[in-house]
Structure formats: structure tokens, C-alpha cells
């Protein structure tokens, strides 16, 4: 009788132990905390199971992470995200939409992501610092709190966008591969683009820029500088220009066949109102 009771007890204990081990294994499995689709794109992180300080693994199951694409206000719950283990990372996108004002994320570090080419960040209102890897080709920053950027090592950078933030200065002198520079609603008063001979398109909107020298940018196709303090634009050395947009009253020096649009104060006001609605 005792032997039978002992056997039953052993079986029960074994079952309980298996359940406990299975539960622990399930909780600690990356597949249970991270979702990677068939395109090797990380699209979901279970913050409840991970906690607010995220460490992204190199792979989940047999899927190596090449893209991080987090687009939802849900991700505003992330306080920090460590991607240093993701050695094959090529694209990083973080879009918080309406949750951006609640975000506590202050820093992103991509120094160990040697294959990373594209960084896009939007509505991370607390974000103060980004450290890039030298191979980055595209940087798009919208609605951040970044005041300073160090892009000196980004020799391959060809597209730079910064919208809606307190950026006060930008040094692009080492980024000679740039063909697009778009800056809107920032605090930049001066910018030097003399060394950017490959530059094709520039946008400066809503910045206190007082002058813009494009005399050394022969490949420019589009210049849009309005809602600024620029009063004179010399296009004498820009034979490829097709589009020019400036504030009403801006003096354009030099002959050009480009299509010219003059923005009035009323135009700017309507544009600002439309932006608020969106």
C-alpha cells in the first residue's frame, strides 16, 4: 500500500515539476517576447514580459533580425532599447504616433550595428541623443528633443531629414555624399553646404536661417527655403535647378529656367493650420 502511494506521489510530483519547468521555459523564450515576421523584421515586443528596458536578441528562433520596425503608441512604454546584439540590423524604425509625449526613451546607440543603413525615428519627445554607426546612409528624425548631432563619421550618408525639434546647429562638411537635406521647424541659424557637391534637393522651412550659399552646389535640382529669414538667393551657379520655393519678397539673383513659387504670409499660415490638423 505504501509502495503504491509512493508511486502515485512520485508521478504527481513529476507532473508538477514538468509543468513548472515548462512554464519557466515558456516565460524565458525569445519567441514569447519578440515577434519576427518572415521578412526578418521585428514588429512586436511584449513589454509586459520584457519590462520597459528592452534588450533585443540577435535572432528569435531561427530568424535573424535584419529590420526593427516598431510603429505604435504602445512602444512609448519602452524606457530603453539595447540593439547592440543585433549584428545583422540594416533598418531601424521607431514611430510612436500619439504616445510620443509619454515616452521616456532618451538615448539610442547604434555603434555596434555595423550593417545599419537606415534610421527613422518619430515622436520620441524625450529622445536627446543618438549615436550612429559610420555606415548609415539615411537618417530621418521627426519630433525628437535632439539639440546636437554628430554626423562626422557618416561618410556614406545620402539623405538627412530633421523635422520639429530644438536642433541649433548641424555640421555637414564631412557628409559629402549627401544628395538630400530637409530641415523643418528647428533652431538653425546658419548652415554650410559648400562641400556638398552631390546635393540635389534642399528644404529649409520654419528655421531662423538668414542666408544660404548654394554657389558650390552645381547639381541642385530643387531649393525650397521658405518661412525663414533668407532675403537673397543667388542661383547663378545652379544650372540644373527646376524648382525654387522662397518667401515673398526674396531676391533671386541670376538667370534660371526653374519654376519659382513665392510663399506669402497667408500661405504659411494656412500651411501651419493644416499641419496642426494633421
Predicted features, each with a name:
Residues 23, 115, 161-166, 182:
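Compositionally biased, intrinsically disordered low-complexity segments enriched
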Residues 2-98, 103-118, 123-125, 132-137, ...:
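N-terminal capping/linker segments that flank leucine-rich repeat
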Residues 75-79, 102-106, 125-128, 145-147, ...:
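Canonical position 11/12 of the leucine-rich repeat
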Residues 68-70, 81, 92-95, 108, ...:
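Conserved hydrophobic beta-strand positions in leucine-rich repeat
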Residues 10-12, 19-20, 146, 188, ...:
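Short hydrophobic transmembrane-like helices used for membrane targeting/insertion
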Amino acid at each position: 500500500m505504501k509502495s503504491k502511494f509512493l508511486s502515485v506521489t512520485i508521478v504527481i510530483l513529476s507532473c508538477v515539476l514538468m509543468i513548472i519547468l515548462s512554464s519557466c521555459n515558456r516565460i524565458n523564450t525569445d519567441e514569447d517576447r519578440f515577434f519576427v515576421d518572415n521578412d526578418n523584421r521585428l514588429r512586436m515586443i511584449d513589454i509586459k514580459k520584457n519590462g520597459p528596458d528592452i534588450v533585443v536578441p540577435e535572432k528569435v528562433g531561427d530568424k535573424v533580425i535584419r529590420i526593427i520596425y516598431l510603429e505604435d503608441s504602445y512602444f512609448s512604454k519602452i524606457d530603453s532599447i539595447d540593439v547592440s546584439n543585433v549584428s545583422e540590423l540594416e533598418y531601424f524604425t521607431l514611430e510612436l504616433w500619439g504616445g510620443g509625449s509619454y515616452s521616456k526613451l532618451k538615448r539610442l546607440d547604434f555603434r555596434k550595428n555595423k550593417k545599419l543603413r537606415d534610421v527613422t525615428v518619430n515622436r520620441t519627445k524625450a529622445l536627446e541623443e543618438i549615436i550612429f554607426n559610420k555606415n548609415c546612409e539615411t537618417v530621418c528624425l521627426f519630433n525628437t528633443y535632439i539639440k546636437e548631432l554628430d554626423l562626422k563619421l557618416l561618410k556614406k550618408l545620402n539623405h538627412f531629414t530633421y523635422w520639429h525639434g530644438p536642433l541649433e546647429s548641424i555640421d555637414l562638411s564631412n557628409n559629402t555624399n549627401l544628395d538630400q537635406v530637409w530641415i523643418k521647424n528647428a533652431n538653425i541659424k546658419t548652415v554650410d553646404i559648400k562641400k556638398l557637391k552631390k546635393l540635389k534637393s534642399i528644404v529649409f522651412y520654419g528655421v531662423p536661417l538668414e542666408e544660404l550659399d548654394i554657389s558650390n552646389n552645381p547639381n541642385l535640382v530643387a531649393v525650397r527655403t521658405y518661412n525663414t529669414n533668407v532675403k537673397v538667393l543667388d542661383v547663378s551657379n545652379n544650372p540644373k535647378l527646376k524648382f525654387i520655393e522662397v518667401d515673398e519678397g526674396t531676391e533671386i539673383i541670376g538667370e534660371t529656367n526653374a519654376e519659382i513659387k513665392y510663399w506669402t504670409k497667408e500661405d504659411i499660415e494656412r500651411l501651419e493650420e493644416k499641419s496642426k490638423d494633421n
